[in-house]
Amino acid sequence: MTVKTRFAPSPTGYLHIGGVRTALFSWAFARHHKGEFLLRIEDTDLARSTAESVNIILDGMKWVGLDYDNAGNVVYQTRRFDRYKEVIAELLEKGDAYYCYCSKEELEAMREKAEKEGTATYDRRWRPEAGKTLPEIPAGVQPVVRFKTPLDGVTKWTDLVKGEISIPNEALDDLIIARADGTPTYNFCVVVDDYDMGVTHVIRGDDHVNNTPKQINILKAIGATLPEYGHLPMILNEQGKKISKRSGDTVAITDFGAMGILPEAMLNYLARLGWAHGDDEFFTMEQFIEWFDLKDVSPSPSRMDLKKLYWINGEHIKITPNGKLAELVKPRLALRDIHETEKPALEDVLALVKDRAQDLNTLADECLYFYVKQTPTEADVQKHWDDEAAARMLRFAERLEGLEDWNTEAIHDLFKPFCDEEGIKMGKLGMPLRLAVCGTAKTPSVDAVLALIGKEEVLKRIRA
């Protein structure tokens, strides 16, 4: 058997971080088992689903690097209405579905009664049964189609995350599978899609647990082999509440990109939300695929920890090739009015500073003074700069100007003799020198910084 999983987002605005975690686990499960990971766009909400929202999903999947095996044949539910109608007709013909002519008022009265009695909402008055007389069909009413849910027994499955789950069928409604206008409903479309796509493992959020018995009963009615189900726990915000834009939480995956998070780091972090492999915190996706097993997924909700996310991101920045980092940092430098990054070469700058940043935006800031001297803070000036320091910088500039070989080692060799002559410690040279050349007291080793900036530019800045 070839393992087939799917990710089935609804294009109604943005790609949610919880959805990406679901996609990641489905993707990793398929890759671990040498199977297929498929993408389906559940766009039957015609009022909210837009082409722009579809592109947001596709772009988000591309950004995080979750490749799907039906890239040339993504399933769109709106293109499958004929297929859904075909299956509904088959269910009607077999007696596994029926027409219901209840009005909104009748359904509301049933709902209120069911709430009081704790029973299923719909009283099944239009459900055909042996010896039962159905009401007279009202004139001018377009019926919905309901699925004939079994009245006795239980629907149960062994959830790959939550374990044994059993739901009495008497607690389930005869759910609507086609609306009065003929459009199919969510729970029905999902079943037909999973069946036609050959999905063997449905891995999704645990907000779908209540849908599962309904879908299992429909799958049985159409003669399908049941997939296995695994329901993932929610991701909560740092306060332990549901992630929400209204609460100020970052929810869209593209927003994390704007925050300077690498896609590899984002996936690494999301993998650790609800899943563990010993004490391993930092790993590649190749390792994750090798290690991943749904039995290691906790059924309890996970909580966001932005501090941990940034730490993991910093670790990934350290191992990212400088050339790749340069392509990611250049646009951020352009936003900071730095467009020329040849002298010094940005890759060389990144090699020196990338272990000082936990996100790409901070990394871009760390590169600025290599190209343009920054304005020092008042605190740095008060602490490290005075007339004596200014005069000392001019004297040291003469030593720098006399260097024939401009490199880190040659610059470093000037420090001790100069400090001895001036009767000062290195801090009295290094900190003012950083301010004079870079405009900040926080830089890597100053000899390496000067070597990269270049002799002509260093002397110009000191003497400005």
Swiss-Prot record:
Pfam families: Anticodon_2, tRNA-synt_1c. One of its GO terms (molecular function) is zinc ion binding. A motif ('KMSKS' region) lies at residues 242-246. It is found in: Cytoplasm. ATP binds at K245. GO terms for cellular component: cytosol. It is an enzyme of class 6 (ligase). One of its GO terms (biological process) is glutamyl-tRNA aminoacylation. It catalyses: tRNA(Glu) + L-glutamate + ATP = L-glutamyl-tRNA(Glu) + AMP + diphosphate. Keywords: Aminoacyl-tRNA synthetase, ATP-binding, Cytoplasm, Ligase, Nucleotide-binding, Protein biosynthesis. Its EC number is 6.1.1.17. A motif ('HIGH' region) lies at residues 9-19. Catalyzes the attachment of glutamate to tRNA(Glu) in a two-step reaction: glutamate is first activated by ATP to form Glu-AMP and then transferred to the acceptor end of tRNA(Glu). Monomer. Belongs to the class-I aminoacyl-tRNA synthetase family. Glutamate--tRNA ligase type 1 subfamily. This is Glutamate--tRNA ligase. The gene is gltX.
